[in-house]
């Protein structure tokens, strides 16, 4: 009799665990607030912030919104892959304004460890260009600033930034997160 009770309890526990898993799946986006640190692996730390940074020469039809991904990888450094596109369906980093996805219009990469190669140029994203992604290697601190053209009718709606990044070195790990701005 006792064996049957233990067996039933074990089956019940496994059924409950399968129906209500406790752990987050690897590709489920983590929800964070602006300013919170997101960790990828043991060496890469990312903080997302709104910014008043200007993107000179880039015209927007709606409201300009700049979001900065501040990164720190320490002396060991990191190699990171991300995919940006002016088409929100193809971009792995985009702004959610209400129910609308807004793709970035331009990007500035600022990584002091690049030395003279750190030109901080504004790269305008072309909707016709469907290039794969960007791989960058850096040490210590750096940032990626993104300009979004938010339609005027969405200027008062809550904003969230959806981000999918892959750290290639020193270990291979992908992370998705959504930041409430």
Regions found by a protein language model. Give the residues of each.
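The feature marks short-to-medium sequence segments in extracytoplasmic or secretory-pathway proteins
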Residues: 61, 74-140
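N-terminal post-signal-peptidase region of extra-cytosolic proteins
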Residues: 50-57, 68, 127-132
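N-terminal secretory signal peptides that target proteins for export/translocation
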Residues: 1-2
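Surface-exposed edge beta-strand/loop patches
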Residues: 22, 35-36, 90-94, 122-181
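Short, solvent-exposed loop/turn segments enriched in Ser/Thr/Gly
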Residues: 63-68, 142
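Low-complexity, acidic Ser/Thr/Pro/Gly-rich terminal tails and inter-domain linkers that flank the onset
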Residues: 26-62
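C-terminal segment of classical bacterial N-terminal signal peptides
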Residues: 14-21
